[in-house]
């Protein structure tokens, strides 16, 4: 999702209600998390690829094409897609595509670490197929050649999650957990 350019949010919808901290734009939140992950990976000298660095709303097709080009050159990569949710729920949830794939193991590791690290945060697990993730054929999960995992870091339209998504400690803990998972996936 897009960021804020000259005070204008680049993606229709994808925002919280205008509560006490103001409107939380999903694209803005996503960038907070991704940029902190990038900083930590840089400091640890861990290589990564960023398939959506623009502040404009980059299409799913463009992001997928970029990911597929990277995968052609480096088939060891996987996709971590960061989001903030909406729809009246609460908590963290993660998604992989339908069926048992490499992404299920990655997603289960990420969600296990988040459960351990995000003390007191509701986790929305789906154990119906033996792992924690939910399965949906979202474009960014189904179309790339690389394994892909999508994480929803909380619900922008739930008061507790809204406050968490603005909270520095919550974001730092989330980022530390995601970086730990990246390191574990790559066995670094």
Where are these regions (language model features)?
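Short glycine-rich His-centered loop
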Residues: 1-23
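Active-site-proximal helix/loop segments of hydrolytic enzymes
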Residues: 24-188
């Amino acid at each position: 999702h897009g960021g804020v350019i000259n005070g204008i949010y680049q993606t229709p919808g994808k925002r919280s209600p205008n509560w006490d901290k103001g409107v939380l734009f999903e694209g803005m939140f996503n960038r907070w998390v991704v940029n902190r992950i990038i900083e930590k990976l840089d400091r640890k000298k861990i290589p990564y690829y960023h398939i959506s660095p623009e502040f404009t709303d980059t299409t799913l097709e463009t992001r997928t094409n970029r990911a597929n080009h990277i995968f052609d050159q480096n088939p060891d990569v996987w996709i971590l897609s960061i989001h903030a949710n909406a729809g009246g729920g609460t908590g963290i949830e993660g998604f992989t595509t339908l069926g048992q794939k490499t992404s299920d193991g990655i997603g289960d590791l990420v969600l296990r670490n988040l459960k351990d690290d995000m003390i007191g945060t509701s986790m929305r697990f789906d154990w119906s197929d033996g792992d924690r993730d939910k399965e949906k054929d979202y474009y960014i999960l189904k179309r790339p050649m690389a394994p892909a995992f999508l994480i929803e870091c909380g619900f922008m339209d739930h008061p507790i999650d809204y406050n968490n998504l603005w909270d520095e400690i919550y974001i730092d803990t989330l980022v530390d957990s995601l970086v730990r998972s990246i390191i574990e996936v790559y066995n670094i």
